[in-house]
């Protein structure tokens, strides 16, 4: 089980990234637009740099919804390999069948 503070920190980052996504996209579009004057593009770069680091989508970590484990997660199920195995062996994951031969 992951620390509650780590899980909450990640949830806070998700919220910040979601709220700041339109503004970041607007600034990045201005920076990438070569037809804009250099001063305007530089000002947009400074504004983007002033934004909080945690508002960037790259700071978000995929975590297990059940345990909060940060590594070895399946995106489709949003579960770690350990939680997926436990739920799968109990028959709680639809379509997942334990192989035997």
Swiss-Prot record:
KW Transferase (keyword) present: no
A Pfam family recorded for this sequence: Ribosomal_S14
Keyword Ribosomal protein: yes
GO cellular component, one term: cytoplasm
Any one of the GO BP annotations: translation
Basic residues composition bias: residue spans: 11-23
Domain of life: Bacteria
InterPro entries linked to this entry: Ribosomal_uS14, Ribosomal_uS14_bac/plastid
Biased composition (Basic and acidic residues): 1-10
Chain residue ranges for the region called Disordered: 1-23
Residues in coiled coil: none
Keywords: Ribonucleoprotein, Ribosomal protein, RNA-binding, rRNA-binding
GO MF annotations, alphabetized: rRNA binding; structural constituent of ribosome
Functional note: Binds 16S rRNA, required for the assembly of 30S particles and may also be responsible for determining the conformation of the 16S rRNA at the A site.
Subunit composition and interactions: Part of the 30S ribosomal subunit. Contacts proteins S3 and S10.
UniProt family annotation: Belongs to the universal ribosomal protein uS14 family.
Name of the protein in its database record: Small ribosomal subunit protein uS14
Organism: Bradyrhizobium sp. (strain BTAi1 / ATCC BAA-1182)
């Amino acid at each position: 089980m992951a620390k509650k503070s780590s899980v909450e920190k990640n949830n806070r980052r998700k919220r910040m990234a979601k709220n700041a996504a339109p503004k970041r996209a607007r600034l990045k579009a201005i920076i990438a637009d070569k037809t804009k004057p250099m001063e305007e593009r530089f000002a947009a770069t400074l504004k983007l740099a002033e934004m909080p680091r945690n508002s960037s989508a790259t700071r978000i970590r995929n975590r297990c919804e059940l345990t909060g484990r940060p590594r070895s997660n399946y995106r489709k199920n949003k579960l770690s390999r350990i939680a997926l195995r436990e739920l799968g062996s109990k028959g709680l994951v639809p379509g997942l069948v334990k192989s035997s031969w």
